[in-house]
């Protein structure tokens, strides 16, 4: 469907009704990044290669980063469990003394180690993580980790409609 920029702007404003004029671009970029991740997972599943999808939702807990919300790449310190090393060169957005941070860092890094070791990411303390399929299952990493089916449905359907 062809749309003028004016009509697309109206649709975006209606969809992101909670966004301020200054933050709508951030929401659009976040959604587009998520859409690409979902598209890659979908294509991998369709081609038989398979894959897993996760979303990192744990908001930063340091005073200077609390206002960011869960940002792109903030999970990297969890991936490499950088919280145990006070001299880490990693950018850290979370309080290394927080028990939730410590626990998630151990479980997430352990999950990735298990995946590299065996080809299966399960067994390191997180919920049973299914391969991406028609249910669009996604591991949500947060204070409490869980599996959600199609957690970005509203956004996915909107971006499919406007493309």
Predicted regions and their residues:
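Generic hydrophobic, helix-prone segments enriched in Leu/Val/Ile
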Residues: 1-2, 101, 158-163
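Non-catalytic, well-ordered alpha-helical segments in soluble enzyme domains
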Residues: 101-124
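Tryptophan-rich aromatic "cage" segments
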Residues: 144-163
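A structural signal for short secondary-structure junctions
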Residues: 71, 106, 131-133
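Substrate-gating cap/lid region and adjacent catalytic-acid/histidine neighborhood
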Residues: 1-99, 111, 118
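Polar, surface-exposed loop/tail segments
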Residues: 57-59, 119-144
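Short capping/connector residues at structural and topological boundaries
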Residues: 81, 85, 134, 144-146
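Short, charged low-complexity intrinsically disordered segments located at boundaries
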Residues: 41, 69-74, 138-150
